[in-house]
Design a protein with these regions (language model features):
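Long, hydrophobic N-terminal alpha-helical segment
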Residues: 1-55
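Hydrophobic stripe of amphipathic alpha-helices that form coiled-coil interfaces
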Residues: 50, 54-57, 81, 85
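Intrinsically disordered/linker segments and immediately adjacent domain-edge residues
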Residues: 58-62
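Short amphipathic alpha-helical coiled-coil/interface segments
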Residues: 64-78
Length: 144
């Protein structure tokens, strides 16, 4: 992880590099990541609903202020783990884990309706560019 050039590649893609993950390591964090994603989606939906109800003055509402602080806290938890939350529509939790596959800086990509981290994509490919993680990189119990 002490590769400054690699850190720069992730930084340029808007993803500060806290650590790199193997598919196995990403999957081991999932119980905690799932809890954090659940909190993010819940708070995000509540904020969106309150903004629609309260209109332009929503940011002055005490409950909105409290929720925003809570929201920033759970996002920070996610960042401290080294991964990034990606679904700000709050439809479904989407999380990227920085990784290197075949010498290329990529992100392992997990959706909250998936049982494990099974896909990855290039830093700029986005969700539409997802590919299956090569089986050789998965733990035997992760191969579906």
């Amino acid at each position: 992880d002490d590769n400054p050039a690699l850190a720069e590649v992730f930084e340029e893609a808007g993803m500060p590099l806290v650590r790199l993950f193997t598919p196995g390591e990403a999957n081991k964090t999932l119980p905690l990541v799932k809890r954090i994603v659940s909190d993010i989606v819940d708070i995000g939906r509540r904020l969106r609903q309150m903004a629609a109800t309260l209109g332009p003055n929503a940011d002055e509402d005490e409950e909105v202020k409290r929720l925003l602080v809570e929201f920033q806290g759970v996002l920070r938890e996610m960042e401290q783990l080294g991964c990034s939350y990606k679904d700000y529509n709050f439809d479904i939790g989407l999380v990227d884990f920085p990784a290197v596959i075949d010498g290329e800086a990529v992100v392992l990509c997990w959706r909250s309706d998936e049982p494990s981290v099974m896909y990855y994509h290039g830093l700029y490919a986005g969700f539409a560019g997802r590919k299956a993680i090569p089986e050789a990189l998965l733990e035997p119990e992760e191969i579906v």
